[in-house]
Amino acid sequence: MKDRTQELRTAKDSDDDDDVTVTVDRDRFMDEFFEQVEEIRGFIDKISENVEEVKRKHSAILASPNPDEKTKEELEELMSDIKKTANKVRSKLKSIEQSIEQEEGLNRSSADLRIRKTQHSTLSRKFVEVMSEYNATQSDYRERCKGRIQRQLEITGRTTTSEELEDMLESGNPAIFASGIIMDSSISKQALSEIETRHSEIIKLENSIRELHDMFMDMAMLVESQGEMIDRIEYNVEHSVDYVERAVSDTKKAVKYQSKARRKKIMIVICCVVLGIVIASTFGGIFG
């Protein structure tokens, strides 16, 4: 009969090599994934920092009736940088999302896939939070610019309601603000100059908001659909932490009780030894 031991051993070694290759490939894939996660997190942090800088520029521009061009250019650069970085983040998150959907379509389920889904959900939520802050910052700045325009119109003797001013802004025509204003004083001219400056800022803002609107809504809807899953994960994590803390507490109590019991046993043994010595001495004295 032919001995197939060597053949079987070779086949087993080949299977082992395949398993090692798969494991190494999977580990390399996850390493690359986590590098991508860190890159995305860095981009989101950069957006957050730029948003804070945008707030400072807004305050500087509003503090001056005629802000210098350098400050306005720096603000535009910040807004442009936020837009570019946000598009990068969106593209990378979309890529991860598609990869996850492909694996789910093949009915694959693994710890690695769950990790990737959790990371993707966390990053998506963080991204939307940062962009929401940026959107709120822009909206607040628009309202402040609008308020300044209204005050300057009042200086020229022209009173407008909030609704009327909104209609004027939506017209996109700067000349509409000069209508009915008598340009007979330097105050009126200065007021009109600031009105035109603020109106220009509002137009830029609205263009920026419009450009980011579709991306923002897309990511917001994604996060909303993931919300329930994220809440469930957070609930499980919190309860796992509580369980671990209780387990540690119970372990400490057990060690404490065990230590007390051990000390009691030692005391009993010592008492028995002392009692034995006393009895032995007593009987020794009697029979001595």
From Swiss-Prot:
UniProt keywords, alphabetically: Cell membrane, Coiled coil, Cytoplasmic vesicle, Exocytosis, Isopeptide bond, Membrane, Neurotransmitter transport, Phosphoprotein, Synapse, Synaptosome, Transmembrane, Transmembrane helix, Transport, Ubl conjugation
Spans traversing the lipid bilayer: 266-288
UniProt domain t-SNARE coiled-coil homology: residue ranges: 192-254
Gene Ontology CC terms: endomembrane system; neuron projection; plasma membrane; SNARE complex; synaptic vesicle membrane
Annotated localization: Cytoplasmic vesicle, Secretory vesicle, Synaptic vesicle membrane; Synapse, Synaptosome; Cell membrane
Membrane topology: Single-pass type IV membrane protein
Regions annotated as coiled coil: 68-109
Sites of the Glycyl lysine isopeptide (Lys-Gly) (interchain with G-Cter in SUMO) crosslink: 252-253, 256
Annotated spans, Disordered: 1-20
Post-translational modification: Phosphorylated by CK2. Phosphorylation at Ser-188 by DAPK1 significantly decreases its interaction with STXBP1. Sumoylated, sumoylation is required for regulation of synaptic vesicle endocytosis.
Compositionally skewed regions (Basic and acidic residues) per UniProt: 1-13
Coarse class of the protein's main subcellular location: membrane
Modified-residue entries (Phosphoserine), positions: 14, 64, 95, 188
Site residues by UniProt ((Microbial infection) Cleavage): 253-254
PROSITE patterns per record: SYNTAXIN, T_SNARE
Residues making up the signal peptide according to the UniProt record: none
Annotated GO MF terms: SNAP receptor activity; SNARE binding
Spans within the Cytoplasmic topological domain: 1-265
Biological process, per Gene Ontology: exocytosis; intracellular protein transport; neurotransmitter transport; positive regulation of calcium ion-dependent exocytosis; positive regulation of catecholamine secretion; positive regulation of norepinephrine secretion; vesicle docking; vesicle fusion
Origin superkingdom: Eukaryota
PANTHER family: SYNTAXIN, SYNTAXIN-1A
Family stated for the protein in its record: Belongs to the syntaxin family.
Quaternary structure, from the entry: Part of the SNARE core complex containing SNAP25, VAMP2 and STX1A; this complex constitutes the basic catalytic machinery of the complex neurotransmitter release apparatus. The SNARE complex interacts with CPLX1. Interacts with STXBP1. The interaction with STXBP1 promotes assembly of the SNARE complex. Interacts (via C-terminus) with KCNB1 (via C-terminus); the interaction increases in a calcium-dependent manner and induces a pore-independent enhancement of exocytosis in neuroendocrine cells, chromaffin cells, pancreatic beta cells and from the soma of dorsal root ganglia (DRG) neurons.
Function per UniProt: Plays an essential role in hormone and neurotransmitter calcium-dependent exocytosis and endocytosis. Part of the SNARE (Soluble NSF Attachment Receptor) complex composed of SNAP25, STX1A and VAMP2 which mediates the fusion of synaptic vesicles with the presynaptic plasma membrane. STX1A and SNAP25 are localized on the plasma membrane while VAMP2 resides in synaptic vesicles. The pairing of the three SNAREs from the N-terminal SNARE motifs to the C-terminal anchors leads to the formation of the SNARE complex, which brings membranes into close proximity and results in final fusion.
Name of this protein: Syntaxin-1A
Recorded name of the encoding gene: STX1A
